[in-house]
């Protein structure tokens, strides 16, 4: 399926064509190319907004210029709902990682890091190995080469 939003954003990461071109995404409908571009775009927005996750998310959804013009999250209903949904999911995933490590055998004591986002609650979570898709796309496996500190 070729995912296209009503505003023209394309692919899994819903990149606008101009953004995809700026990121040198050759095919917005190729999952690898689209996800790579989307991740680079989000990383760039995180740097632009000084690691302020809500602002970076708002810029990803509404556009960087809208966040700059409004000096914060724009008053667009869709954007505000998007930021809230993503941050709630972020909180759930951080809590899941903590619970997973608390249930792990004591012999596998992880390093502890602080997971937070600007303006929000912080939780303590373990460093988890980076995950890569297993051969054949049948799940995720730890990537031992990309493990350890964030």
Residue ranges and their predicted role:
Residues 88-150:
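Cell-wall glycan-active module
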Residues 1-109:
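Catalytic glycan-binding domains that act on GlcNAc-containing polysaccharides
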